[in-house]
Amino acid sequence: MTLHITDFRDGFPMGTTRITDENDADNNVPITLEVVKLAAGESVAITAANETAWLLMNGAASGTVGGTEFSFERSSLFDESSSCFHVSAGTNIQFQCSIDTEFTVYSCNNTKSFEARVFSPADVANEPRGKGQVNDRCLRYVRTIFDGSNSDPNTELVLGEVITFQGAWSSYPPHHHAQPEIYHYRFTEPQGYGHGELGETVLKVRNFDTVKILDLNDHAQCAAPGYGMYYSWVIRHLPDDRYTVPEFTEEHAWIMDPESKYWDPEV
């Protein structure tokens, strides 16, 4: 499967759409990504087969996961923080949607047990990353839902969201890491677009696109002026190398120093 998946630019149908499969033969990122769209009144009652995270994109749902109750509602990816639940294989998931609802669902083949977690917007900060760097040209909001700092050692996924301001950069300075990753994109307008780097390759990304990130490639991003850019990001830990922080490309890391000198127009 290609690294840049553009098959769904017209949107997703009701039901379940698989975008990536952890067993893909080509350009394999060992994470399955699906979009699940449910109608008002529709319910879900399943037992998770693998480690799985359900991230609410829009809509409203309430129920229980592993005996823990939740009630989610979201109308804006850009102005509201994350609602998500993260479960291990064998966990019972039951909920009902009060309005049309959409989730992105991330899973991987991991049968190790851990306690089900529910994350509400109050649990997930809008971190203003890049604040004070190069006149705030790469200021963005990073929402880390769960990573090694707040999840069980038996987990294998890391999940978060990034809000890129219109005309600005994110995932900057360019950075890379050994662990495979997936970005899934949405924009404030249907015609919105941005650019995503994969090493020396630059991709034009649009609404509903997905990009696989492999091979220690740098993956800085930018949004076209006028269009806010959202992407979810999901990483899978490696067996002997759990993800902690990215490695910034040395030649561009100087911009992280708030005292760094850079050109700005005088008039």
Predicted regions span which residues?
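Glycine- and acidic-residue-biased ligand/ion/polar-headgroup-sensing regions
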Residues: A48-E69, Q166-G167, Y172, A178-T210, ...
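Conserved metal-binding segment of the jelly-roll/cupin
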Residues: F78-S98, C108, V205-G226, S232-R236
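Conserved hydrophobic/aromatic beta-strand scaffold that supports enzyme active sites
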Residues: L33-K37, A53, C84-H86, V105, ...
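Double-stranded beta-helix
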Residues: T101-V142, E197, S232-V267
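A short glycine-rich, His/Asp/Glu-containing loop-to-beta-strand
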Residues: D10-S43, D136-I182
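Hydrophobic, proline/glycine-rich low-complexity stretches
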Residues: M1-V44, E51-A60, I255-D257, K261-V267
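Extended, compositionally biased flexible segments
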Residues: A25, T32-Q96
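Non-heme Fe(II) oxygenase catalytic core, chiefly the N-lobe of the double-stranded beta-helix
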Residues: F85-A89, Q96, E102-P174
